[in-house]
Amino acid sequence: MRSSLLFCFSVWIAVFSHGQDPSVQMENTGAIRIMQLRRDGPTRVRYPDALPSLLELMNERSLANFDPDPLFIESLADERLFEHPVLYVNCDELPNFDFSSEENEALRRYMTLGGFVYLDAGIKASFLGTDLGHSYAAWEERAEVRQWFEQLFPDQPFTPLPRNHEIFRTFYKGLPGNEYLRLEEDQKRLPDTVLTFVEQEKWPQGTYSMVGIKVNDRLACVASPICAMGWGRDEFGAWIPPISFRVRESAEDFDETLQVASFAGQTYEVTREDGLKDEIYLVPGNRPLWVKEPTGRWRIFKYYSGEEISNYAHSFYARLGMNVFLYALLN
């Protein structure tokens, strides 16, 4: 529980699900407004419709009452920071991570007094380059984020959130079902190879790669690979933009073949959930080609696209985003 609050808010939330019981109820006294940091105004915006779409979706699927228009602030020294419970930051939108001492002190106080900070794209594997995807095995905050928060809480490093953390089941539990895919009856569902990889490795139990910082024994900040790409909807309610899946696949003789394959690109190491390292091999242009895993197994990256895959990914990211924001309000 929060020991002290500089702002006051309350919300009434009931679980919107298929066959699940409402889990949490609180008094509803008005719309909750989520803040978003935009240091360069609209010039570096990524996924401009993402957060408003997610807030509208939370209003549709729960009894929560969110203002669908985020409150944009250009500086962490903005006095309005202390009037709202959650600050959202898309780290890919920041021109740099050079904050003034006044801004850092304001953010430190905000988190100490009960504020919650969500750093989207706060995890970014170095091999991705300009790729909008992510690695399911990235469990470290990006270096700029780590250096920034070391100034605020030098004794509180980011630590990975375990798969059983409540943030992954605050509102939704597990992976999306076919009812969220919006497919016609004659359209196929996810290919079995893709679904198996997603269920067992990419997003096990509907979880994700996240790290967080605790302040006064309360989770006050989380960082994740980019999620906003999965929140946007157009005026007709269709998901935008299209999302493809990158999965790892193996086949007979892969281990022997890839060890001797000709290769002219770069390699990067990525930290896995178990702390071991995957070695990623890239073709020119920073597109992952294959991976050498610490077990000695080699697998190739294969890319799948299509409406059923895109809808599934959007459903997952939207459910995850809802879990994060509702967790922030309830803890």
Regions found by a protein language model. Name each.
Residues V145-V222, C227, F254-Q259:
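Acidic, glycine-rich loop-and-strand cores that form catalytic or ligand-binding grooves
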Residues Q20-V86, N90-L94, A228, R246-N331:
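Aromatic-Pro/Gly-enriched surface loop or interdomain linker
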Residues S4-V15:
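Bacterial N-terminal signal peptides
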Residues Q25-T29, E79-E83, E102-E103, Y110-T112, ...:
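Extracellular/periplasmic catalytic domains that process cell-envelope and extracellular macromolecules
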Residues R33-Q36, P85-N90, F116-D120, P157-L161, ...:
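Structural recognition of the beta-strand scaffold that forms the well-ordered cores
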Residues V45, F127-E140:
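Short, flexible/disordered intra-domain loops and linkers
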Residues D21-Q25, S75-A77, P204-C221, E235-F236, ...:
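Short, surface-exposed beta-strand/loop micro-motifs that present aromatic residues
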Residues V86-G133:
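Short alpha-beta junction capping motif
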